[in-house]
C-alpha cells in the first residue's frame, strides 16, 4: 500500500511538471510567433500606401515599379493607382489636404497630349496632381517640394502578317522607371514623413507644400497648371524639385545653377551637401556627353514665373532614363537615404528663408 502510494505520488508529480512545462512552452511560442507578424490587412494597406510606418524608400520604389503600377503612364490604371498610393500616404502621415480639403488637383489634357505615349488606348481627359501641406506660421510664404510620378512606355513598331488589314502596328512595352522617377517620389514621401514628425508640435515658419506632379512627361503639364492655379495664393515661394536620382556608380548630383534668380538657393543647398557628405558635381542637370542640356523637369514651371527653384537630379541619366535599363537593379538605396536626409536637413535649417 505504501509503495503503491509512492508510485502514484511520483506519477502525479511528473504529470504536473509536464503540464507546467507544456504551458510555459505554449506561452513562449505564442510570444515568439506574435512578434513581427504583419496581418493580411496591414499588407494590403502597405501595398496601397496606407501604412507608411512599414514603408521606406526601397519598399516604396518596389511598389511603384511593380506590375500594379508599372510605367505609370498618364491615362492608365497604373497612373491612377500611383496617384491613390501617394494620396493615401500623405493622408496617413498627417499632411493636410492642400486644395479645398482635397489632396487632388485636377489637370485637364487635350486628346493629342493623351495619345503621345499610349497611342493604342483611349484615355480620360483629366489627371490629378497630389498635393499635401504642413501649414506654417506665415501662410503667405511657402516652399514647394516636388517630384513627378508619371512615366512612359517604350513604343516598338511591329509588322503584321500578310492577311492583316493593317501592315503596321505600334507595340507598347511597359518599363519600371526606377530612376525616373520612382526614386524622386520615394524621397518626396519619406521627407514628408520625417518633416511631419519634426513639426508635430511647433509649426514651421512658412508652409511646406509636398507636390507629386502628374503629366511631367507630356511637357510639365501638371506643374505648370499648379503654378498657374496657386501662385497668387502666396506672396513668395520657391521650389525644390526631385527628378532622377539614386543610380549606383560614380555620378554625383548635378548642381550647376543656370539661372541667377536661383543662385542663393543653390549655394545654401550645396553647403548642406558638403556638411552631410553627399557627392555632387558642378555640372548642369540633364546634360549629354557633349555637355548639351537635353532634358528638363518641373522646376522650370516655377522659373518661368521668375521664382527660384532647384532640381535635385543626378548626372549621367541621359541614355538610361526612358529605357529598359532604368530598373531597380541600378538603384543605390543608401545614396537615396543620404539625399533624403540632406533635403530634410536643408529644410529645417533654412526654415526661416524664402528664396
Give the residues covered by each predicted segment.
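Active-site-adjacent substrate-binding region
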Residues: 252-355
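C-terminal motif of bacterial Sec signal peptides marking the signal peptidase cleavage site
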Residues: 21-23
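Acidic/histidine-rich catalytic neighborhood of metal-dependent amide-processing enzymes
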Residues: 126, 170-264
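Second-shell loop/turn segments in exported
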Residues: 43-51, 67-78, 116-121, 170-181, ...
